[in-house]
Curated annotation (Swiss-Prot):
<dbReference type="GO" id="GO:0000977">
    <property type="term" value="F:RNA polymerase II transcription regulatory region sequence-specific DNA binding"/>
</dbReference>
<dbReference type="GO" id="GO:0000978">
    <property type="term" value="F:RNA polymerase II cis-regulatory region sequence-specific DNA binding"/>
</dbReference>
<feature type="DNA-binding region" description="Homeobox">
    <location>
        <begin position="173"/>
        <end position="232"/>
    </location>
</feature>
<keyword id="KW-0597">Phosphoprotein</keyword>
<comment type="subunit">
    <text>Interacts with MCM1.</text>
</comment>
<keyword id="KW-0678">Repressor</keyword>
<keyword id="KW-0805">Transcription regulation</keyword>
<feature type="region of interest" description="Disordered">
    <location>
        <begin position="86"/>
        <end position="106"/>
    </location>
</feature>
<dbReference type="GO" id="GO:0000981">
    <property type="term" value="F:DNA-binding transcription factor activity, RNA polymerase II-specific"/>
</dbReference>
<keyword id="KW-0539">Nucleus</keyword>
<keyword id="KW-0804">Transcription</keyword>
<dbReference type="GO" id="GO:0000122">
    <property type="term" value="P:negative regulation of transcription by RNA polymerase II"/>
</dbReference>
<dbReference type="GO" id="GO:0000082">
    <property type="term" value="P:G1/S transition of mitotic cell cycle"/>
</dbReference>
<comment type="function">
    <text>Transcriptional repressor required to restrict transcription of ECB-dependent genes to the G1/M phase by repressing their transcription during S late phase. Genes that contain a ECB (early cell box) element in their transcription regulatory region are transcribed only during G1/M phases. Binds the IMEI regulatory region in vitro, its relevance in vivo is however unclear.</text>
</comment>
<keyword id="KW-0371">Homeobox</keyword>
<dbReference type="GO" id="GO:0000785">
    <property type="term" value="C:chromatin"/>
</dbReference>
<dbReference type="InterPro" id="IPR017970">
    <property type="entry name" value="Homeobox_CS"/>
</dbReference>
Length: 353
C-alpha cells in the first residue's frame, strides 16, 4: 500500500483563505479577537475573561450555517476593545463600564464602617473557657436575683436567740456553737439540782434567764443527765472492786485460822502465837473447839459445832468478851477486812549462822 504524505498549509494561507488547499473548507472560526499591525493577536487578561461565557463554535460548518448572514455583536466587540486597551496601557486608569452591559459583574463592596448583616450580635465563646463564663456570656444576667438560703449558717450571741434562719429545715440547721458563761452555768446547775427533768414552762423560763433558746436548754439537761448517770455507774464499779478485794483477804485469814483445828494440841500453842503476830492489829479470833467443820466457802462462813467458846480480844478497849452459843444451833461468824501494816526492816545479820 502506498502511503500519502499530507502537508499542512501555512498559517497566512489559512487566514487569507485564497489558496486552493484541501483545508479551505475547514477554516478556523472567527474568534473576534483583535490583532495589531503586525498580525499578533492580543488576548484579554484572565481575570476579565473568567466571567465571559464563550460560545461553542463548531469547526465543521454545515450548509445551513453558510446560508445564515454573519452577524457580529457590537457589545462583544466594544468589550474586547476596551480590555485590549487596558492591557496595552497598564498605567492608565480603567474606564468604567456601562451599567447596561451584560458582561459587567455585580460585586457588592462591604465598607468597614458598616458590618455585614450575617454577623451575630453576641460574642463567640471560646471552647477553653469554663462553663460558668460561657453561661454568663450567652444568658442575660438579671440584676434582682433571688438569694439562695443554705442550712449551714452562723449566728452571734446577740442574733442567735432572736433571729431564726429563714429556711425550710430550720430545726435541722447547723449553728455555730457558743460557750456558756459561768453565770449561765450556775443558773442551770441550780435548776438541775432541784429537778433534773424540767417541763417546757420551766425550760422557757431558764432560756430567758440564760439568754438561750428553749431547745438549747433541753439539750443541756439531756447531756447533764447522761453525765450524772455515767459518773454513778463508774462509782459503783470501783466500789465492787474494793469489796471483792476485802472478801479475798477475809477468806485467806479464815483458812489460816481453820488450820489450827487440824493440828495436834502440842503444836497448837506455838501456831497460835505466830498467828497472833501476823494477824491484824485491831482484833484476833481464837477457836478453842476442835470440832469445827466448814459447810460452804464464801463471803460468810458457816460452822457447825457442839459447844463453841469464842473469845474476842479487842486491842483498842483492852478487855475480853466471851460469847456462848446454845448447843445444837448454828452461829455465823463475819470476818471484816482489816488494814495490814507493812513489814518492818529486816536485819540481814539475823539470817547468818
Amino acid at each position: 500500500m502506498e502511503s500519502r504524505n499530507t502537508v499542512l498549509p501555512s498559517l497566512p494561507n489559512i487566514i487569507t483563505g485564497t489558496s486552493n488547499s484541501p483545508f479551505q473548507l475547514h477554516t478556523l472560526p472567527n474568534t473576534n479577537f483583535p490583532s495589531d499591525d503586525q498580525g499578533d493577536i492580543r488576548l484579554p487578561p484572565l481575570a476579565a475573561s473568567a466571567h465571559i461565557v464563550r460560545p461553542v463554535v463548531n469547526i465543521y460548518k454545515s450548509p445551513c450555517d453558510e446560508e445564515r448572514p454573519k452577524r457580529k455583536s457590537p457589545q462583544a466587540v466594544d468589550f474586547l476593545s476596551q480590555r485590549v486597551t487596558t492591557s496595552m496601557t497598564p498605567l492608565s486608569k480603567p474606564k468604567k463600564l456601562s451599567s447596561h452591559s451584560p458582561f459587567t459583574p455585580t460585586v457588592r463592596v462591604c465598607s468597614k464602617e458598616q458590618p455585614p448583616q450575617s454577623m451575630h450580635s453576641y460574642k463567640k465563646v471560646n471552647i477553653l473557657t469554663p462553663l460558668s463564663a460561657a453561661k454568663a456570656v450567652l444568658t442575660p444576667t438579671t440584676r434582682k436575683e433571688k438569694k439562695r438560703s443554705f442550712a449551714f449558717i452562723t449566728h452571734s450571741q446577740e442574733t442567735f436567740p432572736k433571729k431564726e434562719p429563714k429556711i425550710d429545715n430550720a430545726r435541722l440547721a447547723r449553728r455555730k456553737r457558743r460557750r456558756t458563761s459561768s453565770y449561765e452555768l450556775g443558773i442551770l446547775q441550780t435548776a438541775f439540782d432541784e429537778c433534773p427533768t424540767p417541763n417546757k414552762a420551766k425550760r422557757i423560763e431558764l432560756s430567758e434567764q440564760c439568754n438561750m433558746s428553749e431547745k438549747s436548754v433541753q439539750i443541756w439537761f439531756q447531756n447533764k443527765r447522761q453525765a450524772a448517770k455515767k459518773h454513778k455507774n463508774s462509782g459503783n464499779t470501783s466500789h465492787c472492786k474494793v469489796h471483792s478485794n476485802d472478801s479475798m483477804s477475809m477468806i485467806s485469814y479464815s483458812d489460816a485460822a481453820l488450820e489450827i483445828t487440824s493440828t495436834p494440841t502440842s503444836t497448837k500453842e506455838a501456831i497460835t502465837a505466830e498467828l497472833l503476830k501476823t494477824s491484824p492489829a485491831n482484833t484476833s479470833s481464837i477457836f478453842e473447839d476442835h470440832h469445827i467443820t466448814p459447810c460452804k466457802p464464801g463471803g460468810q462462813l458457816k460452822f457447825h459445832r457442839k459447844s463453841v467458846l469464842v473469845k474476842r480480844t479487842l486491842s483498842n478497849t483492852g478487855h475480853s468478851e466471851i460469847i456462848k452459843s446454845p448447843k445444837g444451833k448454828e452461829n455465823r461468824l463475819k470476818f471484816n477486812a482489816y488494814e495490814r501494816k507493812p513489814l518492818g526492816e529486816v536485819d540481814l545479820n539475823s539470817f547468818k549462822n
